[in-house]
């Protein structure tokens, strides 16, 4: 219970600071830099060597691809029939196909399922969601904004991302028997800064700017992201014999609210950023309710 309370406190604190305390310029970028380049790699280096790799670990990764691929198919077909612009369609594919599997996923999964669940959440995020963002996400952003995707740039972005490098190192170290205890004592406290800082950063960036023509598109998007996508992932896991904590974490990661980085990508490619940020803000708030409820339904 105290872990869940920490999530709400950090999120609300960030929102209050952004509104009333006039934080220094660049604070969000500074926090995000630390989270992505220091805290997240440290967490990966701590947890991945402890993961027991078994055949079911394909599921959390596949769930991330299914969520994105389903969003691309659904909104790609739905957009023209509802008269959406290509920019609107691209924005919904990005923000409703990619979940907040790190900033929200890590702390929520850890609060609900402890370190074993967190290790699986890292697998879903680093082997699933991040490669989807850096590859298929860039392709969608390019296609729907009228730009040409650059495969070499995509490959370099994945290969040089600090947490991905840490993931590769962590897998090798795990195969060799794990870290010496002395190093574990270094990685753990650095990685522990991710949860409070990530949620504080989300609170600082929280935005809610609905327009009267956005509600329909936002409803379609969030209906997919928070309900249909996790349901399809659960069906996939059930029919393929996946169970236990692997199934639960995979489905919950698929059910996470929209990814902050996806909204940033939509903004960079001019894919209706106002809609993207509205869906992001509403989705984050709703997921704080739907994730615990989904966990109960899954028997967590």
Predicted regions span which residues?
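Alpha-helical transmembrane segments of multi-pass small-molecule/ion transporters
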Residues: 1-300
